[in-house]
Amino acid sequence: MVKYKTYVLKRMNMPFTIAFVKNTFDGTLIEALNQVIDEIDKYLKKVEEKFSPFLPDSLVSRHTDLGEALQENFFDLEYQEVYSRSIFVKEETKGLFNPFFEGKYNPTGFVKGWAIETAFMKYIKPLIDNNIIEAGAINGAGDMQVGTSLDSDFSWEIGIENPEDREKIIARYSIKNGAVATSGINKKGNHIKSENDIEHIQVTVIGRYLSDVDVMATVGIVSNKNVWSEFVEKNKLTGILLTKERIKRVFEEGKITDVERT
């Protein structure tokens, strides 16, 4: 029977839960994992220092104050990656996902998923690939990137909460490698906009990379039924959403099915 070793970090005003799975955890392994956790914590701290709109000295906060002046820090590779991908996402979603709300650059809606995915690929995946652990995951406020060794039978069992009753589960997914992101009305931020009435109260999307599915879940909240259906079919999305009309809408590889919510 496998065992779990979990850690919780607090960064970006939210908890990050890191979980490791293996049959046994000896002292040497635990010491090594403690060092990995320290590295992840340092990395998330750097991400926060670069991208937090609440820190006056962050690169994001200084982004619109530079005018035509260029500073070396803004050539930071991660900053450039997030900026370029945020612009791309805005175009791909026809502005439903917008990192320039109120006229200022703020990629908060993209950064969390991207940071979790990046930290996973940088610190957790090598442990899995080298059979140091059997499986690993990083979960940030319900959005997660998970992985499992190719020769392992272990799967991550992920329950999707009912937004109206957090003690109930509306769906369960068994995943070895991939990402899960959930967006809801209560999580809706100013980095997204909608010209339509909100029809979906919660959207969960499952895929390969968290930076992608996190954006898609956000778009699902602000899209009307027709726009979202086209988006699901075009991108062959998998997941589940709840509508205000008490409909549970399941989509798998772009195919959509409505089920009355009980």
PLM features: residue spans?
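Mature catalytic core of soluble alpha/beta enzymes
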Residues: M1-T262
